[in-house]
Amino acid sequence: MTEPASALRIRQAVRAVLITPDHHILLVRFEFPTRTVWSLPGGGLDPGETHLQALRRELIEEVGLHDPVVGTHVWNREHIIPHLDGRWDGQRDRYYLVSASERFVPAPALSWEQLRAERLHELRWWHLDEIDQATDADTWFSPRALGHHVRALITDGPPVAPIDTGI
């Protein structure tokens, strides 16, 4: 029997969509027991934090970006999958555009030991074309249609209301 959605423990999280004018996107590589996933920088809200406070904290911790220019809330994503620590049944992500006038070398405030403890193993700028061409079974992006959604942001600009990205 499936649990009703209201009984699920859903972690609130936030992610940054950093896109340069030449269409590079900053991604983080997470290593999970079953696969590697490239995602956008960010993470869960701490107790009492707003989404924007959490985004700013996560950008300092993971990327070393202080005083980011945060723009529009562009996407939402909810996925129901138990977290490895057993505390959560799923996660609800809010994605915000963050100004990136050029590529920079990420300098996380957290040590690589601390980041690896959170399963984060690499930060890398990907060109949009690279994301589109990464079709092998071992390269997973989160959200799955990341290239499509980024291309829509570049072509059409931010949506009037946040778009559901699917898984």
Regions from the language model: what does each represent?
Residues 19-24, 33-34, 46-47, 76-81, ...:
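Short, charged/polar surface micro-motifs in flexible loops or helix N-caps
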Residues 24-65:
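Conserved Nudix-box catalytic region and its N-terminal flanking loop in Nudix hydrolases
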Residues 4-8, 86-87, 115:
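Short Gly/Pro-enriched turn/cap motifs at secondary-structure boundaries
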Residues 11, 33, 40, 89-93, ...:
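Short connector loops at helix/strand junctions that flank enzyme active sites
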Residues 35-38, 104-167:
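Nudix hydrolase/Nudix homology domain
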Residues 66-76:
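A short coil-to-beta-strand element that immediately follows conserved catalytic motifs
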Residues 79-110, 124:
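Active-site-adjacent beta-strand/loop module that shapes the phosphate/pyrophosphate-binding cleft
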Residues 2-25, 44-47, 95:
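Conserved N-terminal beta-strand and adjoining loop/helix that marks the start
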